[in-house]
Amino acid sequence: MYLQELQLQQFRNYPTAKLTFGQGINVLLGENAQGKTNLLEAIYVLALTRSHRTANDHDLVNWQAKTAKVSGRVVKAAGAVPLELTFSRQGKRARVNHLEQARLSQYVGQLNVILFAPEDLAIVKGAPTVRRRFMDMEFGQMNPRYLYNLSQYRTLLKQRNRYLKDLQHKQNKDLLFLSVLSDQLAAFGAEIIAQRLAMLQKLEHWAQAIHGEISQQREELTFHYATQVADDQLTDVPTITAALSALYAKQQDKELYQGTTLVGPHRDDLHFQVNGKNVQTFGSQGQQRTTALSVKLAEIDLMKEETGEYPVLLLDDVLSELDDARQTHLLTAIQDKVQTFITTTSLSGITRQLIKDPTIFHVAEGTVVADAVDSDDPAASKED
């Protein structure tokens, strides 16, 4: 899978842009605040219908416009697929092969991307919400059923929390409807937990091999999914469902007092351990970075295993955060395998021997010009 072309209309600081990319490494070169990250964001949005930088879609629209459009052409083993997203005050519309999609969940998965930015180091050392979002975004791309379960769960969670708030102000509390919501939430929550466990087991397999190579077999990386459901109950969906229902009943008085749901996958966490110790708490900065790099590279192999296609890799100013050894491992791992987009202010910090025939894009004040350095790729012709 690779992104052949990208078109922008009134997206961020780009009134208009049309770019054709190489199948290998594409370097977005320019000073800070010129629009390099905006281009990566556009690719990310084209894949997932949402930004990794803002929760407000209005931020994506050029301040002089009312509507923004991101479109592209994705080439897969089965052929080329045109994609299009339109953002306006009325919401967003998604098209695949020029056909509007009734639900965004039907759209996600047409273009798979993996983003690695400096803030992704927070996967290891950040708050639990960062790791939950990581699981939801990545597993949702690979598995439409996961995305569906997550959507249903979030809808029910909002409804249940709203009802818990309402019950705080009532003398006679109708707990029957709360019980119905709890049962429904437990069912979808169990599906999510079971799917997370299955995907994490596969991701751990790939990450362990990569982490072992980087650490020269001195360290072993393991994952631990932290949930209030007891380990011996994490066997199958019905057992997890029953366990969640029991936890809701146990926590009912506390939830009524606080007016929020205290149990479920929205409260779970993922712990990374090196040689049996939690990297977040006891790991050095080097171990934390090696863990983050191992996990991101493992995503590439897992996505290929799950979807049959390699994803597009987005490296947003992350090479400057890696030492020479980790940078070498990263660039060697993706060479000739994954279409990659790299943002940087200078090529001097990149080991050029590890970048084969890159397509270079010069970015300045929302204008992009492409040329080639030692490349015969037709995508390297100059283009505004």
From Swiss-Prot:
Taxonomically, which superkingdom? Bacteria
For this record, the Gene Ontology CC terms, alphabetical, are: cytoplasm
Q: Which InterPro entries match?
A: DNA-binding_RecF, DNA-binding_RecF_CS, P-loop_NTPase, RecF/RecN/SMC_N, RecF_2
- Any Pfam family from its record, for instance, is SMC_N
Keyword flag DNA-binding: yes
Q: Where in the cell is it found?
A: Cytoplasm
Which PROSITE patterns does the record cross-reference, listed alphabetically?
RECF_1, RECF_2
What keywords is this UniProt entry annotated with?
ATP-binding, Cytoplasm, DNA damage, DNA repair, DNA replication, DNA-binding, Nucleotide-binding, SOS response
Task: State the Gene3D superfamilies in the record.
Answer: P-loop containing nucleotide triphosphate hydrolases, RecF/RecN/SMC, N-terminal domain
Function of the molecule: The RecF protein is involved in DNA metabolism; it is required for DNA replication and normal SOS inducibility. RecF binds preferentially to single-stranded, linear DNA. It also seems to bind ATP.
What is the recorded name of this protein?
DNA replication and repair protein RecF
